[in-house]
Amino acid sequence: MPLTKIEVCKRWLPVQVQTIIEAVYLAQREALKVLEGDRQIRFVEHCPEHFHIPAGKSGNYTVVEINIFLGRSIEAKRALYKAIVRNLGRVGIDPSDILIVLHEIPLENWGIQGGVLASEVDLGFKVNV
């Protein structure tokens, strides 16, 4: 159940936004074995005054921040990063313009299904992939 935020400064066309969201979602499905339809992804476009692009980066600079349950393996994380970069490359975003940050949060720090601790719920999938 990743909770994902994609932040950009560039204005993308609506169809491009959906393609970017889909690219990140498919990477999560592939690498983290996320359930089909488990798509909690927000796309945030900032105005230039509110988003500093680091030196050496282009206007396509993209930050992908993902909150996930604690427990994914290094191999799964590596596969996730590679899949995100590959998929976003198909949209025209250069690998050097992509920053990915994972926040691993223990199950007891997620309130789901009406505020129940995620550690007390049958999630329907394995976290330790």
Descriptions of predicted regions:
Residues M1-V129:
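Interaction-mediating elements
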